[in-house]
Regions:
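Carbohydrate-associated surface elements
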Residues: 123, 244, 266
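Short alpha-helical donor nucleotide-sugar binding micro-motif in glycosyltransferases
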Residues: 168, 358-359, 366-371
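Aromatic "clamp/platform" in nucleotide-sugar-dependent glycosyltransferases that forms part
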Residues: 379
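Short hydrophobic beta-strand element within catalytic cores of glycosyltransferases
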Residues: 396-399
Length: 480
């Protein structure tokens, strides 16, 4: 296989990733193998290595960055002012999460519609080298990586700077949007500033709340909050997908209000449709045959990453009490994550709960459509891709009253917006069950409203708004 740099070839026997294949991702080329520090679990010593590695990587490459600065300045003069080129960078691009999935959908759409967008991140530690997936997603060779504290199957990584510089010379950009405030993003930020590239950020992850939820050490929350203030102070303006987090950026992270821009996200909703309902996909995972079901149960689902910060411990307790009262309800968990085995153990012997594993394509879309109600109690999501996807198949959603999802759902019309209180969720589940069983016309109206609500989150509307903002940002940054 030819490498991204065009210099060497890997052997046909070389494994490109020791993880199971992730749906929809195909390696189209690779980087040559490069030195990296051995991947390690989190620890004080390992964490203490991050700042020296970041600053050493920056210092070593300053001469090349200054040379790149001069090259990009000349190249930019030869292009029209409204010709904007942007690089989206996320350290967690090589994982299964909402950020990675959203970016991997948005960037191909932008490129297909003549928007000059590029996507890069760090290759996961299970890869022997960097790679390019689907001809557009650049997973850079890593210099350093360690497991993320309190968050299995995720890592903190620092990419090698050399390949980044070569790619920026080959594909010059005007703007870099940083998606996550991780070590690699700090390094890219510093390098971009030296190279004279305008850098800004997108508040996609509520890192302080994640830290408070997943890490036992209380001091870590305040330390992370301090780091976030510095990071978002360096990467203004900051894009927020919803009002709640725009307020957090100004109140907690001290970003000036005029430096916060609300830009709702878009999703490729054409693959999600109410027409996929009733095709027999749900029955493949709940242990029954379509013909064998005399009475169809009321179906609830959670679809997404199975991890604790999604507030699934709360959902488990609520469901246990709700299902104890009814034998005509069932809950389907769809997805994979480090918390999955704990949930299976919690529901061991409970016939009302099923697990479909990680799914994609038509199977995933059909599971959304087959659900009667979608449950999403997370209080850490800045947007809620899965909520939009569920509603795009006509499935009403029950969400928390905090974060991005409650901006999507219309309370009592396309679902319910609820405080994180067990009684409130139990009452909503009871009402949802009653509505489905006793008022089919009202339930169908709710499905139609949910579907119509998602039309504002199409890829077309969101990318158009984004690029209009990017053009404005470029003109302000370079005084064009």
């Amino acid at each position: 296989m030819k490498t991204a740099s065009g210099s060497t070839k890997l052997k046909a026997t070389d494994a490109l990733d020791s993880r199971p294949h992730i749906f929809g991702r195909t390696v189209t080329s690779t980087f040559r193998k490069m030195f990296s520090f051995r991947h390690q679990p989190p620890g004080n010593l390992r964490t203490g290595m991050i700042p020296p590695v970041v600053f050493l990587a920056l210092l070593v490459n300053i001469p090349k960055l200054l040379k790149l600065r001069f090259y990009l300045k000349q190249e930019r003069k030869n292009r029209p002012g409204d010709d904007v080129r942007i690089l989206f960078y996320s350290d967690n691009l090589d994982e299964t999460n909402g950020i990675a999935n959203n970016l991997r959908n948005v960037i191909p759409y932008m490129r297909a519609h003549n928007m000059k967008a590029f996507l890069a991140g760090s290759a996961f530690n299970t890869r022997p080298c960097g790679a390019v997936e689907n001809s557009y997603c650049i997973l850079l060779p890593r210099l350093f990586s360690m497991e993320q504290l309190g968050y299995a199957n995720s890592e903190l990584a620092i990419p090698r700077v050399g390949p980044v510089l070569r790619l920026l010379k080959r594909y010059p950009v005007d703007l870099i949007e940083l998606e996550t405030p991780s070590p690699g993003a700090w390094l890219v930020c510093f390098c971009a500033k030296v190279a004279g590239i305008k850098v800004f950020s997108h508040y996609r992850t509520d890192v302080p709340t994640y830290t408070r939820t997943l890490v036992k050490a209380k001091w870590m929350y305040y330390f992370v909050l301090w780091l976030m203030k510095i990071f978002y102070g360096m990467t203004k303006p900051v894009v927020s997908p919803c009002r709640d987090y725009a307020d957090i950026l100004t109140s907690q992270l001290k970003v000036p209000k005029n430096q916060v821009k609300i830009l709702p996200r878009g999703l490729p909703l054409e693959k999600f449709s109410p027409d996929l309902r009733g095709k027999g996909v749900w029955e493949q995972f709940n242990g029954t045959e379509v013909s064998a079901q005399t009475v169809r149960k009321v179906r609830f689902s959670f679809i997404g990453r199975i991890s604790k910060e999604k507030n699934l411990e709360f959902l488990n307790n609520v469901w246990k009490k709700f299902a104890a009262k009814h034998d005509d309800v069932e809950l389907m968990y769809v997805g994979y994550g480090w918390y999955l085995e704990e949930i299976k153990k919690f529901f061991e012997g409970d016939s009302s709960v099923h697990f479909a594993g990680e799914q994609g394509g038509d199977t995933l879309a059909s599971l959304y459509a087959d659900s009667d109600f979608f449950l999403f109690p997370s209080v850490t999501d800045t947007f809620g891709n899965v909520v939009v996807e569920a509603m795009a198949t006509g499935t009403p959603a029950l969400v928390s009253n905090y974060g991005g999802p409650h901006d999507i759902v219309m309370d009592n019309e396309a679902g319910h917006i609820l405080p994180i209180e067990e009684n409130a969720w139990l009452d909503a589940l009871e009402e949802s069950r009653r509505l489905y069983l006793e008022e089919p016309e009202a339930y169908q109206k709710m499905r139609e409203t949910a579907y119509e609500r998602t039309r504002k989150y199409t890829m077309q509307s969101s990318t158009k708004a984004q690029f209009e903002y990017f053009r404005k940002l470029k003109k302000e940054a370079y005084r064009l």
